[in-house]
Amino acid sequence: MSTPHINVIGAGLAGSEAAWQIAERGIAVHLYEMRPVKQTPAHHTDKFAELVCSNSLRGNSLTNAVGVLKEEMRRLNSVIIRSADRCSVPAGGALAVDRHEFAQAVTEAVREHPNVTVFTEEIQKIPDGPTVIATGPLTSKALSEQLKQLTGEEYLYFYDAAAPIIETDSINMDKVYLKSRYDKGEAAYLNCPMTEEEFDRFYEALISAETVPLKEFEKEVFFEGCMPVEVMAKRGKKTLLFGPMKPVGLEDPKTGKRPYAVVQLRRDNQSGTLYNIVGFQTHLKWGPQKEVIQLIPGLENAEIVRYGVMHRNTFINSPNLLKPTYQYKKRKDLFFAGQITGVEGYVESAAAGLVAGLNAARLVQSKELVVFPDTTMLGSMANYITTANSKNFQPMNANFGLLPPLDTRIKDKKTRYETLAGRALESIQNFVKKM
């Protein structure tokens, strides 16, 4: 009888972390990476955990959600965070790395682990036996076809079209009202009413705002049925007034009158700490995006926890398909990790790899799989991607809005974040002890 091993497909941030976590638990790993035999349009080397965009892993302080996530990962012996700490370069309050040294450090740590065997080949069929799929946003065509067959075509997406998400506490509730169009069903939307003058000012800012240049392999995105709000706007004002900003059936209960235009906000998570801007998928750069959003009545001081994005990205409908263990619901020995699960960002991808790898190892060891507490960043991210609204699921990054609210409301943002961070780290410490 052959020794049990776990397959890990993809040696990006998530796959490298998953392989490391499994190997550290004494289990053999077969790690498959198609580069350099087959390159993606974004990668340039054969190194593991190659950072293809920025060299920053974002904020490092505990008043920053991704900083808290990193600290949780440090306490779980993350190879990605350990390597980043060793290869860091000065970057103020952020953790930035020398990208070549960082990729080299991760590659060496994982390749040289006695329990890891690396195969340089493209996987075109999902293997039998315990497997972690961590193939990232540029999953190969052959494997995408396999995933389509596995999950069903309607549950596999090839691009992000994410609208901005706002912290509920930062919305001026005196300027907005709760109502559904024509009062159908429960009042599920917050509505931001605009006068004609406010709309004109917003419209001019929107059509003149700077957008992110498209990469060659992303240019097909807009033709797949999802139009950025600024592209829609450039077709004329009426496109918005008859589209996402349509005021019909949304009379303001304070005045009894129909506003000139309305921006709708839809609840984004079960606890109601986050709202997304309906129909506002966008390709605007983040600075101009914030300026445009803050022209919307009620959102003058909006805290944006996830900016609108549109780019090439292969990901699955995790709320329908995954458990918070990152385990596939219909096949208990199959796990997904990284951006393919709908987490967004370098650190978040590695974090998903950590949890998936940990649980794949526990499955092989016949141990109970772990679900991290939702008071931790690791747990709140797993909770979000597996409980978000499956009808309009879009990738999410780490942010404090994912955590359950504190028992006592703290108005000062810095103090609130510090308190949430303290609770998260206490939770992870207690949880790790029990594991």
From Swiss-Prot:
Question: Which Gene Ontology molecular function entries are recorded, alphabetically?
Answer: flavin adenine dinucleotide binding; tRNA (uracil(54)-C5)-methyltransferase activity, 5,10-methylenetetrahydrofolate-dependent
Keyword Coiled coil assigned to the entry: answer is: no
Record-linked PROSITE patterns: GIDA_2
Where is it mostly found? cytoplasm
Q: Which Gene3D superfamilies did the record assign?
A: FAD/NAD(P)-binding domain
Give the enzyme's EC designation.
2.1.1.74
One Gene Ontology BP term is: tRNA wobble uridine modification
Q: Which Pfam families match?
A: GIDA
Name the NCBIfam families for this protein.
gid_trmFO, PRK05335.1
| Annotated family | Belongs to the MnmG family. TrmFO subfamily.
According to UniProt, the name of this protein is Methylenetetrahydrofolate--tRNA-(uracil-5-)-methyltransferase TrmFO
User: Lineage in the entry?
Assistant: Bacteria, Bacillati, Bacillota, Bacilli, Bacillales
